[in-house]
Amino acid sequence: MSVVLLVRHAQASFLEPNYDKLSKLGEAQTHLLGEYWVRHKIVFDRACTGPRVRQRDTLSIASDACRKAGVPFPGPLVLPEFDEYQGEAVLEKSLPGLLTTDQSIRDLHSAFESSSGSAERRATFSKLFEAVIGKWVRGTTCPPGVETWLEFCSRVNSGLTKFLSAGSRGERVAIVTSGGPIAVAMQRALQLSAESTLNVSWMSRNSSWSEFIYSGERFTLSSFNCHAHIDDGAMLTYR
């Protein structure tokens, strides 16, 4: 049996012009993750990451903390299969049409547009984003040029099969990715519905990990959304 840790990237720059960049808090979160691996003597045989800067930098900072402490860390692969779904594109291309046909979306959009202050803007945007993504998952909105939910799930599952099958028995591997791919892994392990999978995706905290046991076709959940490396509750974030 082998073990894979799927790690969600640390906090990115939410509602900033360039989201795909770790915040200062995100950098601190992932440094703590690396230190946790060192303290608990967690050593990986292989590692990979999705292609996004926030994913690659999360692994880079954590692995640097390991190496500085004298703990070996494998050079990572970068696999596009572990990219997040195209949430920004779904929102951008779906919103104009939904604003003309869906009162609930109009209300959520109006609440976001009239919000002020960082906390309120985060909360109102999250509600709008989750509502639009929910429609995409259910197939209510299918913007052209954007992969469907089923295509996204197929991509992630293909990546899991490719990366995990390339190893050997008894190894421990790490995959740094995003909340969506981690939820697809949960779906794979627990046979979740699309709606439940989406709900799970909102639960992953930044820099948390979920552990799975695998061998051949067997893929079993061991733990979900662990963040034992963070003691300060103020450092726990979803976005």
Predicted segment positions?
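Phosphate-coordination/substrate-recognition cap region in phosphate-metabolizing enzymes
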Residues: 35-125
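Active-site metal-binding loops of divalent metal-dependent hydrolases
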Residues: 10, 179-180, 225-227
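Acidic, low-complexity terminal tails and accessory targeting/binding regions
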Residues: 2, 68, 85-106, 112, ...
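Short, well-ordered beta-to-alpha junction loops that form the rim of enzyme active sites
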Residues: 51-52, 81, 173-180
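Hydrophobic, aromatic-enriched interface-forming segments
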Residues: 116-167, 177
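Conserved beta-strand termini and adjacent loop/short-helix elements that scaffold enzyme active sites
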Residues: 7, 79-81, 224
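Loop-to-helix element that buttresses phosphate recognition and phosphoryl-transfer chemistry
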Residues: 3, 10-64, 76, 148-155
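Beta-strand elements within well-structured catalytic alpha/beta cores of enzymes
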Residues: 3-7, 48, 171-177
